[in-house]
Amino acid sequence: MDCIPALKALGEETRLRIMRLLFDDQLNVTQISERLHVSIYNISKHLRIMTEAGLLETEKSGKQRLYRVADGLKHQMGRDLPVLDLGCCTFRLDRFLPK
């Protein structure tokens, strides 16, 4: 993974909250929007940036597109501590729970 685009993509609190939300689940834009109380328009922009940076993968399910954390980036430490491993650095996602 190229760390610079990934770090740029993670340099915004809403995107870190999205990563935390998607760490354990696959969700569509509407579900993410509802859980984070952020407009669908803004969530869509964040998801595009994160997908282009290689942080997220998508899967088509009917008319919906489901988003998830990219394979190989998810790690668990200790007791269910979600950690995002970019190769160059790691992020503890437990601090970025949906509000």
Walk through the language-model features, giving the residues of each.
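Generic hydrophobic, helix-prone segments enriched in Leu/Val/Ile
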Residues: 27, 53, 91-93
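Generic detection of intrinsically disordered/low-complexity segments and helix-coil linkers/edges
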Residues: 35, 40, 61, 82-85
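Generic marker of residues within folded, mature protein domains
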Residues: 8, 57-59, 81
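Amphipathic alpha-helical dimerization/coiled-coil segments
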Residues: 2, 72-99
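N-terminal helix-turn-helix DNA-binding core of bacterial DNA-binding proteins
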Residues: 2-39, 48, 64-74
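Hydrophobic alpha-helical membrane-insertion segments
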Residues: 20-24, 55, 80
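Beta-hairpin "wing" of winged helix-turn-helix
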Residues: 52-61, 68
